[in-house]
């Protein structure tokens, strides 16, 4: 059985936690239609490295955790998420992988501090929802990476439609190109591209960078 670690005391739920308490039930059934590039990112990571210790920040329902376990059968995987409801889904989804998977209920506002570090830190459609906080998350990821380790990101990038940007803001997403400059400055880019979704309604970013 996989492990869930939770702090002994918790503050009141945030707006984001309340948002995902309901969305956890429908997340996997709906997000395929607009969270593009997730499977492709895992495939590309596998062409660059063979990580044995991996961390996903904002692991949600565990879709990527299960994918990492299948692609890297010798690896140990840790997932961190602020939503108990999403972690409950992730626990069911990753049970077949047993003790290889550890789930942690916490914010990622400071490094986990594992002495061995991680070969890969993955952020999949998470950083754009950390507002404020994505800068802090990137600093924590850099500290948690082992020497030579990589940060892998797929996320919303930008849109030229103000109405769509405002709507995404209602759903806690910031998408005004804020992530790419920080990623390029903080990590050595190995993959760094922006692609259009739905004919250019918005763009999404795929980035893999090595720890400097």
What positions do the PLM features span?
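Short alpha-helix
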Residues: 172-187
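Core SAM-dependent methyltransferase catalytic element
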Residues: 188, 194-212
């Amino acid at each position: 059985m996989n492990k869930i670690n939770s702090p002994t005391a918790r503050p009141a739920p945030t707006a984001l936690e309340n948002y995902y308490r309901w969305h956890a039930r429908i997340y996997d059934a709906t997000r395929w239609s607009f969270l593009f590039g997730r499977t492709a990112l895992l495939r590309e990571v596998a062409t660059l490295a063979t990580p044995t210790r991996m961390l996903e920040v904002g692991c949600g329902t565990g879709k990527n955790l299960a994918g990492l376990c299948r692609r890297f059968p010798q690896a140990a995987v840790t997932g961190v998420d602020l939503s108990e409801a999403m972690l409950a889904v992730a626990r069911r989804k990753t049970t077949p992988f047993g003790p290889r998977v550890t789930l942690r209920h916490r914010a990622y506002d400071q490094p986990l501090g594992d002495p061995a570090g991680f070969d890969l830190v993955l952020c999949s459609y998470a950083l754009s929802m950390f507002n404020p906080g994505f800068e802090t998350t990137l600093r924590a990821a850099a500290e948690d990476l082992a020497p030579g380790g990589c940060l892998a990101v797929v996320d919303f990038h930008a849109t030229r439609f103000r109405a769509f940007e405002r709507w995404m803001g209602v759903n806690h997403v910031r998408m005004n190109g804020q992530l790419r400059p920080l990623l390029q400055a903080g990590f050595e880019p190995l993959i760094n591209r922006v692609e259009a979704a739905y004919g250019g309604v918005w763009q999404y970013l795929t980035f893999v960078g090595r720890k400097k």
